[in-house]
């Protein structure tokens, strides 16, 4: 992930959001503001980061900010997440384009929104990084084709191997778009993709389900890219290496977030 996101040095801003963190942010970096926003960009970007990085509700984020003397309503946090979340995610997506593993895992899960059933189609690479996610009303070949076209456009390259469950829509769509790609279809082969759905389930519980298909799509599109940045595979790292990579990830997040022309 270092090469993928162009990590550089920077000041760490930890998840605990301590007083020391805020002092570091305000003293080490020049104050920046987004147009037509009275709060500093550092506070807005941190609120957005908290909301998408952790399974927190909007009111949870409001309380975390209030505990540090920053009085922001949960409605304002919601507006920030809606306005800036996808902008940040798109910057991350552009940086990582075409740099994922060449083995892709695809999966779909059901999401119920206002009593209507939707299917959330998701693709991850062999290392668990989210390639893309697409909410659709169907679970058929046409839906699989839309996901694969989105993946090919986003990555700019086809995978070497594609792993799925036994849903026939995958093989039919692959035959049309990527006939030369090896396709392995078996229950359990796409565990990485299945596990990647857990974040959506956790958010569903916090929100008492998504309120609209648009809200769900916006969340999964943003969350996946931010989760990628902080997916550091801790079990394979020494404590020192993990701290260094986390610092680099936070530095990259700040660099991207504060470069947005809002």
Give residue ranges: language-model regions.
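Short conserved beta-strand segments at catalytic cores or DNA/RNA-binding microdomains
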Residues: 55, 114-130
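Charged, often Cys/His-bearing segments associated with DNA-binding zinc-finger transcription factors
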Residues: 1-114, 146-262
């Amino acid at each position: 992930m270092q090469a993928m996101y162009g990590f550089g040095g920077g000041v760490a801003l930890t998840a605990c959001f301590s007083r020391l963190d805020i002092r570091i942010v305000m003293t080490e970096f020049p104050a920046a503001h987004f147009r037509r926003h009275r709060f500093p960009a550092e506070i807005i970007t941190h609120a957005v980061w908290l909301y998408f990085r952790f399974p927190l509700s909007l009111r949870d984020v409001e309380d975390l900010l209030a505990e540090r003397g920053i009085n922001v309503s949960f409605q304002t946090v919601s507006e920030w997440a809606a306005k800036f979340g996808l902008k940040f995610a798109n910057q991350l997506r552009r940086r990582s384009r075409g740099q994922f593993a060449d083995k892709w895992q695809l999966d779909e899960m059901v999401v119920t929104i206002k009593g209507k059933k939707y299917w959330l189609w998701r693709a991850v690479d062999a290392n668990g990084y989210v390639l893309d996610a697409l909410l659709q009303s169907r679970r058929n070949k046409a839906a699989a084709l839309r996901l694969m076209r989105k993946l090919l456009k986003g990555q700019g390259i086809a995978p070497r191997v594609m792993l799925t469950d036994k849903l026939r829509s995958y093989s039919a769509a692959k035959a049309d778009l990527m006939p030369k790609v090896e396709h392995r279809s078996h229950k359990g082969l796409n565990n990485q993709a299945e596990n990647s759905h857990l974040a959506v389930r956790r958010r569903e519980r916090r929100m008492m389900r998504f309120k609209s298909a648009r809200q769900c799509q916006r969340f999964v599109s943003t969350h996946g890219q931010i989760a990628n940045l902080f997916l550091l595979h801790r079990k394979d790292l020494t404590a020192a290496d993990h701290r260094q990579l986390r610092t680099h990830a936070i530095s990259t997040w700040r660099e991207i977030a504060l470069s947005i022309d809002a």
